[in-house]
Amino acid sequence: MTESTQAISWWQAEPSRLARDRREIEAGFPDLVLTLEGQGHWSGHLPMWPLDRPEPPGVTDLLHGRGLGIAVSYSAAYPVVSPYVVPLDPKPLAEELTQTRWHVLGNEALCLFQTQADWDPSSSVTDLLLKAAGWRIEYGLLKAGVRTDMTMAGIVYDDSLDHLIAEAATRLAPVAEETTATAEQAEEGTTR
């Protein structure tokens, strides 16, 4: 008689870790939705400023009123291996993938560690979500031209870039106005 060797997902093997992730993510990031298919993933938008300090002026304008849209994908090796956080809105351009200054890997996931060994299996996924929200701010700073590269440690625990947010938002305002005007003109042209 042969036994069936059917693979099970990490969340079936470690229900207590699934419960912990759910509890922590739902408390801090209520707009994310969990899908338990395959190895499972979370999707949705992060808050614009979930950091543990006052929000600097200009965040809403810099982010166009919306936090980073993401997919957090688990692998069968979770929690030993960290999940991947993939930015979906905004989605980095193809030429930004694998360039160190953008902190995006070739598989389109964010580079949130110096090395994969920096992930501790007992760490919370919410630490990655905070880093991803910080990545969105830094991405906006690069796009606005007030920075040429992202910081090595991120802005989650470092407020040294906060003063640049309002400047970046001011630089982006004329671009946003032009884009809106162009879109309105195009729409008028199609309705005539």
Which residue ranges define each predicted feature?
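UBC/E2-like fold recognition across ubiquitin and ubiquitin-like conjugation systems
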Residues: 1-67, 77-192
